[in-house]
Amino acid sequence: MENVEKTSHIAPNLLNRDFTATALNQKWVTEFHVGQETLYFSPLMDLANRESIAYNFAIRPKFSLVKKMLEQGLSRIKPKECPIIHSDQGVLYGTEEWVKMLEGKAVQSMSRRGNCYDNTVIESFFAILKSECFYSRTYHSIAELQAEIEEYLVYYNQKRIKLVFKGLSPVQYRAQYLS
């Protein structure tokens, strides 16, 4: 199933705006988002350290966009871990294929329709990405835009400090958590 038009499944909002996580791979957030209406970007963020742990790009909103992102994310978890994966009610997150991919590996959660506050952490990430990466630049190709986002993700994960983590980057916080 590549072209999807209608959400067939709506999951309950398990996070209910509780964006805290006491362990890595406990709660993940994602959103299906359009940048410049020509490049689709689908990131997955771990709420424990605010690290973008998986992502994918596509030029069309096909299921393969979120499938690859989810496969990357699930490859990081240990056998007994079963994260909550919270998203908006985007069409691709309501497909039968998405629900099947999560079975036995993750628990699905969805924001209420049209309520950006139910997924505020990823919305904030997109706002930061736009202000630090897009607003002052003009991109001449999809490849240039994608390369810039990928470079920014390295910076965001490895160098961009978070006050909530006492001046550590997401990767530094994860390393400290695991030590």
For each predicted feature, which ranges?
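Charged DNA-binding/catalytic regions of mobile-element recombinases
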Residues: 1-179
